[in-house]
Amino acid sequence: MPSVDTASAILSSLDVLGVTHVLYCPGSRSAPFAYALEAGSFGGDARPILDERGAGFAAVGLARTGALPAIVVTSGTAVAELAPAVLEASHARLPLLVLSADRPGELRGVGASQATDQSGFFGTHVRASIDLEPQEASPSLVGHLARAVAAACGAPSGTPGPVQVNVAFRDPLTPVRLASDSGDEAVAPFVPRPTRVMGAHAVPARWEDVVGPADAGLIVAGEGASPRAREWSEASGFPLLAEPASGAWCGGGATPFEQSLVSSPLGREVDAVVVTGRPTLSRPIQALLARPDLRVVVVDPHAPWVDISGNASVVVADLEPAREPIRAAQAEWASRVREAARDAGERIESLLASGSGRTMLDLARSVAASTSGPLVLGASNPVRAFDLAVPALEGRIVHSNRGQAGIDGTIATAVGICLGSGYAGETSAPVGTRVTAVMGDLTACHDASSLALAASMGAHLDIVVADDGGGGIFATLEHGRATSPEAYDRWFGLAQSVEYEALAAAYGAAFARAGEPRELEDLLDRPVRGPRLIHAPVERAEDLYRAIRDVLS
């Protein structure tokens, strides 16, 4: 079967199997997919993208919005470019497909150009790796693809994540004339009849059976938390402590400044914790979950479940809300937690008001106050700044690549979120709203080439570069105290000399500069169409971070 016809059969099968987007990176061995896309073999959203690394993280962003994307790359180093995005998707449990074009078996291991051993390249970081040799379109081909999509979605009983489908193509890689073109008997087109694989539904455990009575219980929600976290909190009286990217802020009900609780004498009274998602931002939270005297209930529908300290008392796939009335002792303790959070908020407000007003913490508050669309927070300092200083994100959708917590591909991820959320091109989003991505200067520089992706996609995206002159996150960790300022700047800071206005112009993005958070608020109140790079210099303010942590302890 001609390679283009095989590519067409693959794309049409993925279309009916539920793949929503195809991101195509150009190449010769992957060219059959290009011809098939041009011929309309895929009915969803198909877009060409130059940079494989950017395409990988755009797919991560799409998956974060609930889409099911596929990335098409050619053979050789193009496959390796996807490794950072595949790792992020694997640890964040995000479904996506990698369609890697390959040489046929007889051209591998013999010195052929652009040929390497790329089948199974991603090892344990993919849920499945399928190797397709050149073959006819058939139910067997569709069956392999159905298994790939099911594995990516975690069906019927696995964990969602990336899947590699390695597709070998023989020459010719261009369309060939069919018999029907020459007047001979027409060949019936291949019509895929895919297998639908349904996910298994977890049976919720009874709250009273696994959590039991508690006088000082908490719910801790990290990235990927159950949407039922707020319901559990309301039914049990357990205060809800939620990281910004947990999703548990939506609709309200979360207790802010969670570190004010767990690091204080009040936190030592905790006797039970229900954990959902993957909480990784706060060292005090991790210390709490490691306490041997604590009953820790992990709610995780997938294996391996999240239990960093190995201290879980019980693990369940799902949990019913409590049925019994809230205990008087629990209600009284929860009231004290809320009062402690209010007190911490007032003291943090006072610290910020007496400061310069030009720190990452001030910037986080300004962004939260002046935007209403989805937020994409850099996985280093920005997400921590929101966690420390922003009292409420009610109703906001917040994303952060905390699967591996790297700075890779943050701009590309934000572009994918724009595509998946209707904030690109002729947007379906509410008028005047945009996606706002907040990241440090090193994160922005690391993914600067994805500004081209933002412009080509018409992403309605504000990229706020909180420029603290290099790796400011390390100054708030032990490394900021363990070395001299000169050594710190040399080995940890790595300040970059970048003309951000010229950078934006080079890629066709709008530009603005915000000298202080108030100027940033004014800019964000005046949305534009397409991508905009906003350079916002901030101070590192290590002393302020330490003062706030003192307030929270």
What are these regions (language model features)?
Residues 1, 287-381, 508, 514-522, ...:
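Phosphate/pyrophosphate-binding active-site segments
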Residues 2-87:
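N-terminal cofactor/phosphate-binding cores enriched in small/glycine residues
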Residues 7-12, 28-34, 337-432:
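Active-site diphosphate/adenylate-binding microenvironment
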Residues 46, 88-89, 95-99, 106-119, ...:
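Thiamine diphosphate
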Residues 64, 75, 80-81, 205-208, ...:
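Glycine-rich, anion-gripping cofactor-binding loops and their flanking helix/strand elements
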Residues 72-74, 95-102, 123, 133, ...:
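Short beta-strand segments
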Residues 100-148, 242-344, 454:
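Glycine-rich, acidic loop regions that bind phosphate or pyrophosphate groups
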Residues 120, 157-202, 522-553:
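Glycine/aspartate-rich loop-and-adjacent alpha/beta segment that forms the canonical ThDP
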